[in-house]
Design a protein with these regions (language model features):
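Short, low-complexity disordered leader/linker segments with a strong preference
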Residues: 1-28, 53, 80, 102-109, ...
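Hydrophobic alpha-helical segments within soluble ligand-binding/sensing domains
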Residues: 25, 72, 128-153, 167, ...
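Hinge/cleft segment of the Venus flytrap/periplasmic-binding protein
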Residues: 25-27, 164, 175, 179-182, ...
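Extracytoplasmic "Venus flytrap"
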Residues: 27-54, 59-74, 84, 90-94, ...
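Short, solvent-exposed amphipathic alpha-helices that sit
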Residues: 39-54, 135-142, 163-183, 197-201, ...
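Short beta-strand elements in bilobed, periplasmic/extracellular small-molecule ligand-binding domains
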Residues: 53-65, 155, 176-193
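Hydrophobic alpha-helical
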Residues: 77-80, 85-106, 172, 191-253
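Flexible loop/hinge segments that line or gate small-molecule binding clefts
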Residues: 95-134, 138, 145, 152, ...
Length: 323
């Protein structure tokens, strides 16, 4: 299995150029997601570990009450007012978040996008997250392989305000288009990365079209959990599913044979290494002019935190797969 954390540390060592100016004081990082969501929970421990391991003053996880851009902006402004001097943010809006990032950068508070990118032009220093399009593409290819290259599939995905959702929808479509005409997407259900809408819409789909669908790909946390539970409750292993992330419901469904596999991400590594890099930026480090950035549809300053497919053969050691 790939050691993602080691890879990311090595990658940053290659692209950062120390130009120390001194006198920047103690780094206090705020890690702010777009709203409440289980994916981001790992950022809390990541920040605590970054403080301990790298000598940061703070690296605190703070969550807006709702998925609302204005609430996220108000929270960020409040945190900066409390003395936080570096911000890692999951964009509440791929374009709209740029306004506050620019204001912070102008005020000497460096920022970066974490787990999802803002669109360029931007004053964010970089975007560090899963190549979500590539992950969705690989997951769909694994599903197509499990289906023997033919069948009807459904795609359940996340919030439409999430900058990753469109990338995932396009990637699933690309993988299907490469399947030689044997695979058809019969339903895409988006904007369901919360339990109530996911439970309602996925179970309604299964009741109405469960007999017609051969495979399911989920590209957001909550739809993966709800779909895995639905297949488990049905007790029918005919439908193949590839999920995302590492919720215990999904992992148990893999062990029990109701889910084929899941695409793991690395939220802990994002928060841990992201905090480290923001400290280096505040100390005066600069990125090399020839830094080997990756490019996505949103940015040409992207670092991939990694993704890996896990199935029944290695689900018991999935923690190792995330490292």
């Amino acid at each position: 299995m790939k050691k993602f954390l080691t890879f990311v540390i090595t990658f940053f060592a290659l692209i950062s150029s120390p130009v120390f100016a001194g006198g920047h004081g103690v780094t206090k990082v705020a890690l702010v997601p777009g709203g409440p969501h289980p994916y981001f929970a790992a950022w809390e421990q990541a920040g605590l570990d970054a403080v301990k391991d790298f000598g940061l003053g703070k690296a605190d996880y703070r969550v807006p009450a709702e998925w609302d851009l204005s609430q996220q902006n108000e929270l960020i402004e409040s945190l900066v007012g409390q003395g936080y001097n570096a911000v890692l943010v999951f964009p509440g809006d791929a374009v709209g978040t740029n306004k506050i990032l620019g204001e912070l950068d102008d005020a000497g508070v460096p920022t970066a996008a974490l787990a999802g990118c803002v669109e360029q032009p931007t004053q964010a220093k970089f975007c560090f997250g899963t190549d979500t399009g590539h992950s969705a593409y690989l997951g769909t290819k694994e599903l197509i392989k499990a289906l023997g290259g033919k069948g009807k599939i459904a795609h359940f995905t996340g919030f439409l305000v999430d900058p990753n959702t469109t990338l995932r929808i396009n990637a699933v479509e690309q993988a299907v288009s490469e399947a030689g005409g044997g695979v058809e997407i019969i339903q895409v259900i988006a904007d369901i990365d919360a339990y109530e809408p996911a439970d309602e819409k996925i179970n309604a789909f299964m009741a109405a079209q469960g007999g017609e669908v051969d495979g399911i790909v989920t590209t957001a946390w909550v739809p993966a959990v709800v779909a895995a539970q639905a297949l488990t409750n049905m007790g029918d292993k005919r439908i193949k599913m590839v999920g995302i992330d590492h919720d215990e419901v999904v992992l148990k469904a893999i062990k029990d044979g109701f889910v084929h596999g899941t695409m793991l991400q690395n939220p802990y590594g994002q928060g841990y290494i992201g905090s480290y890099v923001m400290d280096k930026v505040r100390q005066g480090c600069e990125f090399k002019s020839d830094a080997p950035w990756k490019s996505t549809a949103q940015t040409d300053q992207f670092i991939d935190s990694g993704t890996v497919f896990v199935d029944i053969s290695d689900v018991d050691t999935y923690v190792m797969a995330m490292r």
